[in-house]
């Protein structure tokens, strides 16, 4: 009963965008810290069902913290992926799988589990994975949520049932047969809708979307804008398996500070004018060159409609 803080917890392993089913299987990799490990995917499942033998799942550790008053908190290993220590793999893995957020700054799915627990002021509903699979395949759909009594899942308008979390649960799950179309989750409290989320089957890659985290930066030669790059189909749906090589051009008071995509096995340069997308996304970082004025960023890829975004510099 002595009060303490968990100073290094979890050590769960995840690759953003990669899912290994059934989701209630557990993968403890490697067998020992000093024993080489190999899996052809060089990936770890984002269902929170993969961790090191000296650690635990994110949900398992959170359960210990919530259910034991003598634990005042935890330091999760880790918030972000980082270069080096590519547990459980060796070459060509060159960065870690431990993060809640990947190396490019994109949240992995478990980010929303923490948000649902730590942000009671925010209605959270996060349904995953994507909805591009093989016809008839059994797919496990998870939802992290808060501020609600239940979540109902619909596949192409047909209810797949209502789920509620038990005392020690942090997500709800449905196992359904895949059919192209739309999956929708609706969370409710006392019968009233709290939040909704839809995921649609994506078609072929058709266009690029650029989303800067800030549309205005300072003219100090240091300030940055982090621009998310996404590959979309003609209807604006994220293509979850896209690996298009995107090239960037900058005009005006700025330059490319770096690029990334979050892949732990990518050998691409961080300082370059192009990057392949990883599960449909990559990142380009724009830096001011010390001058005021505007900056225009253009993204192009073979066979796709180009995209542009403008950043103000003051």
Map each language-model feature to its residues.
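Extended substrate-binding grooves/exosites of carbohydrate-active enzymes
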Residues: 1-166, 171-178, 182-192
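Beta-strand-rich structural segments
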Residues: 141-145, 186, 211, 215, ...
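Short, hydrophobic beta-strand segments
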Residues: 172-178, 271-290
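Extracellular Ig-like/FN3 beta-sandwich strand-entry sites
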Residues: 178-182, 224, 292-294
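Beta-strand-rich extracellular modules
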Residues: 188-190, 300-304
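Edge beta-strands of extracellular beta-sandwich domains
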Residues: 192-203, 305-313
């Amino acid at each position: 009963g002595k009060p303490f803080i968990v100073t290094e917890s979890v050590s769960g392993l995840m690759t953003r965008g990669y899912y290994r089913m059934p989701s209630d299987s557990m993968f403890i990799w490697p067998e020992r810290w000093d024993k080489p490990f190999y899996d052809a995917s060089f990936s770890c499942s984002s269902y929170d069902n993969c961790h090191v033998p000296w650690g635990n799942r994110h949900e398992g550790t959170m359960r210990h913290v919530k259910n034991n008053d003598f634990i005042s908190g935890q330091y999760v290993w880790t918030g972000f992926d980082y270069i080096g220590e590519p547990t459980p793999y060796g070459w060509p893995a060159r960065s870690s799988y431990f993060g809640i957020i990947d190396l490019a700054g994109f949240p992995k799915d478990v980010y929303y589990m923490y948000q649902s627990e730590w942000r009671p002021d925010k209605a959270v509903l996060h349904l995953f994975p994507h909805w591009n699979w093989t016809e008839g395949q059994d797919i496990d759909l998870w939802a992290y949520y808060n501020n609600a009594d239940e979540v109902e899942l619909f596949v192409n308008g047909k209810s797949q049932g209502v789920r509620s979390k038990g005392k020690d649960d942090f997500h709800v799950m449905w196992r359904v047969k895949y059919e192209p179309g739309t999956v929708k989750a609706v969370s409710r409290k006392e019968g009233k809708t709290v939040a909704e989320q839809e995921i649609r089957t994506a078609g072929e890659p058709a266009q690029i979307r650029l989303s800067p985290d800030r549309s205005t930066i300072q003219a100090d030669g240091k300030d940055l804008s982090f621009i998310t790059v996404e590959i979309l189909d003609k209807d604006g749906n994220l293509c979850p398996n896209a690996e298009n090589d995107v090239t960037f051009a900058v005009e005006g008071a700025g330059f490319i500070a770096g690029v990334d995509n979050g892949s732990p096995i990518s050998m691409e340069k961080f300082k370059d004018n192009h990057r392949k997308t990883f599960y449909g996304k990559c990142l380009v970082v724009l830096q001011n060159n010390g001058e005021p004025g505007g900056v225009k960023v253009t993204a192009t890829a073979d066979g796709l409609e180009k995209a542009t975004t403008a950043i103000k510099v003051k």
